[in-house]
């Protein structure tokens, strides 16, 4: 009986993360699925309350929403994306589960794959950190914080606290089961920044801080024959190829082994700029998901000035907008195919693990052209 009472206590505490009344109760948009963009705020109108974190979209989809940017996905967007399937060619966007090896983040242990034989059959046993390879970042992964102090964590819609994740009997709120049950499918669009640089005979080091601004992403769109003002529609999945994995794959085994052990300011790689310009550009496009072939979508070190504050895209995307990120995508075959077909839109699917209360997952992502 005592254990049952203790479990009940933890559940009650964990589900009462927000104070009452909460500013969200005052400013949350009355979201109507029949007209999901009625009274939709502009980027300049974020956040909806001055007490919310930098450019947070808390309340935009309702005070208790757990889907965030996935609300841009509808039956209509999925149906419209069917027209992108013209050849039937399917391309996996996932690296082998043990790649990179060792993991780029040295705090994450590498994959352990064991075979368990039985009489007449064999099983696998996998022990892995879900973010060592191609990965889908869920909404419990990267909150707002000050100097990464746990006491300052702020998660999407202020629905949970750090203790709700790690304490016994914590909630499943904002877990990756939401994305798994939502059904992530629709139209994808590739911006091949790495190919664009190659076409201009401009060499670059993907393992250095090269910041990709939206002006260059628009230039890539034009180079691909797309209209920068109209190459996306709400609910699209935007994928950027930086060339990071192409350069990584070409390394010697020794160079791959030492790359993760850079420290401090030496931890650098190419990626999208963390700035108001980037966030405004993406907010206006109403994309459901972003992804790239680098470790973080944004450039490293992860830092930029957003609305006058030192922030990064991870904080605003995940903690602010409820927008997941797919990282370490395998995009080289997709890019080659898109260039050959002269088409850069495709049908995109992603089915993450249905782990209740999960933080991240291999994405099992696929493009069908």
Describe these PLM feature segments:
Residues 1-21:
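Fungal secretory targeting signals
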């Amino acid at each position: 009986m005592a254990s049952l009472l203790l479990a009940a206590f933890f559940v009650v505490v964990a589900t009462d993360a927000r104070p009452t009344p909460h500013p969200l109760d005052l400013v949350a948009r009355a979201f109507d699925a029949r007209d999901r963009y009625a009274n939709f705020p502009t980027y300049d109108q974020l956040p909806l309350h001055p007490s919310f974190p930098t450019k947070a979209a808390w309340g935009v989809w309702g005070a208790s929403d757990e889907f965030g940017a996935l609300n841009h996905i509808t039956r209509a967007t999925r149906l419209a994306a069917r027209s992108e399937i013209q050849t039937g060619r399917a391309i996996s966007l996932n690296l082998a589960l043990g790649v990179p090896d060792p993991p780029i983040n040295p705090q994450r242990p590498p994959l352990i794959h064991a075979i368990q034989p039985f009489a007449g059959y064999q099983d696998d046993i996998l022990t892995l950190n879900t973010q060592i390879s191609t990965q889908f970042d869920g909404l419990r992964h990267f909150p707002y914080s000050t100097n990464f102090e746990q006491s300052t964590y702020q998660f999407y819609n202020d629905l949970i606290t750090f203790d709700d994740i790690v304490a016994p009997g914590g909630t499943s709120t904002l877990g990756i089961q939401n994305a798994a049950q939502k059904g992530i499918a629709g139209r994808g669009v590739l911006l091949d920044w790495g190919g664009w640089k190659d076409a201009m005979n401009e060499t670059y080091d993907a393992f250095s801080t090269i910041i990709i601004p939206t002006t260059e992403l628009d230039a890539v769109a034009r180079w691909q024959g797309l209209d920068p003002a109209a190459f996306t529609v709400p609910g699209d999945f935007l994928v950027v190829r930086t060339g990071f994995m192409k350069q990584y794959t070409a390394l010697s085994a020794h160079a791959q082994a030492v790359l993760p052990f850079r420290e401090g300011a030496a931890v650098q790689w190419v990626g999208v700029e963390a700035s108001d310009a980037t966030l405004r550009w993406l907010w206006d496009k109403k994309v459901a998901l972003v992804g790239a072939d680098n470790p973080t979508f944004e450039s490293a070190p992860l830092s930029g000035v957003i609305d006058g504050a030192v922030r990064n895209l991870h904080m605003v995307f995940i903690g602010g907008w409820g927008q997941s990120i797919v990282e370490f995508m395998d995009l080289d075959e997709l890019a080659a195919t898109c260039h050959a077909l002269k088409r850069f839109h495709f049908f995109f699917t992603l089915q993450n693990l249905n782990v209740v209360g999960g933080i991240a997952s291999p994405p099992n992502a696929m493009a069908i052209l």
